[in-house]
């Protein structure tokens, strides 16, 4: 009998058939009676424990997924479109795409802090 894997919202993410694995997301879902499930299950727990810590973002994120960017040392979350910093400012030399009202951007090329109001960016000295 297949396992139906539901999101927290109740929506079905995937159906995993007996004896198979599903790699739709950054975790591997194991079907009933899959030989060798133990290593997969334990790695899944480790990935969750370390918040997918690495120098590059997880390749198959789902909305709400947490990632520890080990290069910047920041915790980020996936908003359904991109990974966003969970606090503080977005840091880059170019204006980040997808800013929402109240977001900060630190222009590391010009050492300038900006605040976004939903339409315009304002400098911290304005």
Task: Provide a role label for each language-model segment.
Residues 122-126:
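Conserved small/polar residues in nucleotide/adenosyl-binding loops
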Residues 1-119:
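Extracellular "spike/adhesin" assembly and maturation modules
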């Amino acid at each position: 009998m297949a396992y139906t894997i539901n999101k927290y919202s109740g929506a079905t993410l995937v159906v995993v058939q007996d004896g198979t694995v599903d790699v739709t997301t950054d975790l591997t879902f194991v079907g009933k009676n899959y030989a060798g499930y133990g290593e997969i299950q334990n790695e899944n727990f480790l990935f969750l424990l370390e918040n997918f810590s690495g120098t590059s973002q997880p390749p198959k994120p789902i909305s709400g997924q947490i990632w520890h960017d080990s290069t910047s040392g920041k915790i980020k979350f996936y908003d359904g479109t991109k990974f966003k910093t969970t606090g503080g400012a977005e840091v880059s030399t170019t204006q980040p795409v997808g800013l929402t009202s109240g977001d900060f951007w630190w222009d590391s090329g010009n050492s300038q802090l900006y605040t976004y109001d939903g339409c315009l960016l304002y400098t911290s000295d304005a």
